[in-house]
Swiss-Prot record:
Gene behind the chain: rplV
Task performed by this protein: This protein binds specifically to 23S rRNA; its binding is stimulated by other ribosomal proteins, e.g. L4, L17, and L20. It is important during the early stages of 50S assembly. It makes multiple contacts with different domains of the 23S rRNA in the assembled 50S subunit and ribosome. The globular domain of the protein is located near the polypeptide exit tunnel on the outside of the subunit, while an extended beta-hairpin is found that lines the wall of the exit tunnel in the center of the 70S ribosome.
An individual GO BP term: translation
Pfam families hit by this protein: Ribosomal_L22 (PF00237)
Annotated InterPro entries: Ribosomal_uL22, Ribosomal_uL22_bac/chlpt-type, Ribosomal_uL22_bac/org-type, Ribosomal_uL22_CS, Ribosomal_uL22_sf
Top-level lineage group: Bacteria
Name the UniProt record assigns to this protein: Large ribosomal subunit protein uL22
Keywords: Ribonucleoprotein, Ribosomal protein, RNA-binding, rRNA-binding
Organism: Marinobacter nauticus (strain ATCC 700491 / DSM 11845 / VT8) (Marinobacter aquaeolei)
Amino acid sequence: MEVAAKYKGARLSAQKARLVADQVRGKAVEDALNILTFSPKKAAVVIKKALESAIANAEHNEGLDVDDLRVSTVMVDEGPTLKRIKARAKGRADRIFKRTCHITVKVADK
């Protein structure tokens, strides 16, 4: 049985989030939580939150045992980009892209 949780509109780029997602994909839930807890990256906090939500969904909604769960899928998709303007010298302006992403974490029993 596969159970999912989604985190939409996370304020970090999909490229940076994928670096962390690759570290936990396929691991046991307990190992994945340890990796995310001690990772210094901002994406680790966001992915950990989604993983904890998926674990809670599996335990509460499906009645699965937490010790038997593993991270089956971690998908990071690009979300909408917020476009901002930064004033520069001599009346010029630069564009600033504030990127967002959608994170989907699926856990399954072994």
